[in-house]
A protein has these predicted regions:
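Ribonuclease/tRNase effector modules and their secretory precursors
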Residues: 1-84
Length: 84
């Protein structure tokens, strides 16, 4: 798993760690309505609850032999973030 700089920033301000991202990848559900496809490829939003009960959406993008975490969203709480 490769974490984009944006995803790392969002994870930091939303209190979501790598283990929770892996947990959602393993146990979450793809939100088919939010799959996007552009010139960079497809992104897959996977939603679920972390072990500490955060309701999150993690956006993944397949890339070569890896999987990129594009962004991390808390679906219940609006966190103050200053990510560029």
């Amino acid at each position: 798993i490769i974490f984009s700089k944006h995803a790392q920033c969002r994870m930091d301000c939303r209190k979501i760690d790598e283990s929770e991202v892996k947990e959602i990848l393993k146990n979450g559900t793809i939100n088919h309505k939010k799959i996007q496809n552009d010139k960079r490829g497809k992104t897959y939003p996977v939603e679920g609850f972390t072990h500490d009960k955060q309701h999150v959406r993690i956006v993944f993008a397949p890339k070569d032999d890896g999987l990129v975490v594009v962004t991390v969203i808390d679906l219940d709480t609006e966190w103050k973030c200053d990510c560029k």
